[in-house]
């Protein structure tokens, strides 16, 4: 998993902007984010804020809950453990996409049957056998192993007292409202982030049970929105932002030719959470605020002290935002089960892909100097031809 980082020169990342890491949900694909983070560390990218949903919340908690020198090791420990239940020594010898596809589906079926070490185990008797309303009747799997794993790999005292900001999203089951558990906000309220907040962000029904926090019950945030970019942009307007957004599902893809391909494509669209649309909308909001500021600057002096002008000044305040957008691109042999195929070979491949994509981004220095002209928000997408500047 670290074979790509030995002989690559590190690029220089601008220091003036607050560095943010945004991690989408995506189950077994999450090792792509771990590989991306390892490569970012090699390039001295030290996030001051990590926001995640579902598996992104778990990765985010491991990053925020450890000192810098231990983060990659803890991420490796988690992903080695999660993939230890599906290790087949002969798997790397498979070269045929068709055979590899069969292997992936078999691995996913085994995971669905036996669970993932340190993450979840199947309930026995199964959920339908238990009385309605009992905790065991609400999900097919028991996630108590994940709590023990988080307690072991994450220093929650560090999260609740250290400088790295952590934000994880979940949905309130009763209200249907999206909520973020944010250690910065919690500190002001005298509250603390714990394993339950991370588990709530990843409690995808009906596989995983809801998580109770202060009398309210929560499910996976990906049900409402699988990418926490909007939250970051909404809650930081005073400082420039340099955001690495690491997504696990691509909104773009080919028209399916089979039922299996249709199932995968549907999942990609659903969990990509309209990322490009959200980015475009935020860009339009930034540009509108910029236009308001320009208009205010042209007002006669007699209008400067008008309360309405003061209000417009306040609401139009914006920082400069650069988003570097990395998206995991599915392989031909992957299907709709890719997010619960915790096989060792899949984990290693996803990790390596995350590393490669970060190095590819760093090979295009145009974004490093933030060449934004007079624009307040720009996005760079990594595509097959390199890092592409997206004009919204």
Cite the ranges covered by each PLM segment.
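Active-site gating loop/helix substructures
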Residues: 125-238, 245, 252, 259-261
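Hydrophobic/aromatic beta-strand patches that form the interior of the parallel beta-sheet core
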Residues: 51, 169, 242-246, 322-326
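Short active-site oxyanion
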Residues: 46-49, 216, 321
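C-terminal helical/tail subdomains of lipid-metabolizing enzymes
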Residues: 130-132, 137, 141, 145, ...
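Patatin-like phospholipase
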Residues: 14-22, 27-138, 144, 150, ...
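Amphipathic alpha-helical surface "interface" segments used
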Residues: 96-103, 169-175, 372-388
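Small-residue-rich anion-binding loops in enzyme active sites
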Residues: 1-19, 170-176
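Acidic, Ser/Thr-rich peripheral helices and adjacent loops at domain boundaries
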Residues: 257-299
């Amino acid at each position: 998993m670290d074979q790509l980082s030995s002989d690559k020169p590190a690029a220089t990342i601008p220091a003036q902007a607050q560095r943010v890491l945004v991690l989408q949900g995506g189950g077994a694909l999450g090792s792509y984010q771990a590989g991306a983070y390892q490569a970012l560390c090699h390039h001295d990218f030290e996030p001051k804020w990590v926001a995640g949903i579902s598996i992104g919340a778990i990765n985010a908690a491991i990053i925020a809950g450890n000192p810098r020198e231990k983060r990659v090791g803890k991420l490796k420990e988690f992903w080695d453990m999660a993939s230890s239940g599906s290790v087949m020594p002969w798997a790397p010898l498979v070269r045929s996409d068709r055979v590899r596809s069969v292997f992936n589906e078999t691995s996913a079926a085994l995971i669905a049957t036996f669970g993932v070490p340190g993450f979840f185990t199947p309930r026995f008797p199964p959920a339908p056998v238990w009385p309605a309303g009992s905790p065991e009747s609400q999900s097919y799997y028991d996630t108590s192993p994940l709590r023990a794993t988080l307690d072991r790999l994450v220093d929650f005292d560090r999260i609740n007292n250290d400088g790295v900001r952590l934000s994880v999203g979940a949905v309130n089951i009763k209200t249907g409202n999206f909520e973020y558990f944010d250690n910065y906000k919690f500190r002001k309220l005298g509250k603390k982030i714990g394993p339950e907040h991370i588990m709530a962000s990843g409690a995808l029904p009906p596989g995983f049970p809801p998580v109770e926090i202060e009398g309210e019950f929560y499910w996976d945030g990906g049900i409402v929105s699988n990418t926490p970019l909007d939250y970051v942009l909404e809650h930081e307007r005073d400082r420039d932002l340099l955001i690495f957004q690491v997504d696990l599902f691509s909104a773009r893809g080919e028209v399916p030719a089979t039922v299996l391909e249709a199932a995968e494509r549907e999942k990609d669209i659903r969990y990509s959470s309209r990322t490009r649309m959200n980015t475009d909308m935020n860009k339009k909001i930034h540009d509108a605020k910029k236009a308001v500021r320009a208009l205010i600057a042209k007002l006669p002096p007699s209008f400067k002290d008008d309360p309405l002008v003061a209000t417009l000044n306040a609401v139009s305040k914006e920082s400069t935002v650069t988003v570097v957008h990395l998206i995991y691109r599915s392989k031909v042999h992957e299907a709709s089960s890719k997010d619960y195929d915790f096989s060792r070979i899949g984990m290693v491949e996803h990790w390596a892909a995350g590393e490669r994509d970060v190095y590819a981004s760093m090979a295009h220095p145009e974004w490093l100097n933030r060449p934004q002209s007079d624009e307040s928000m720009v996005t760079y997408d990594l595509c097959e031809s390199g890092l592409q500047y997206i004009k919204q």
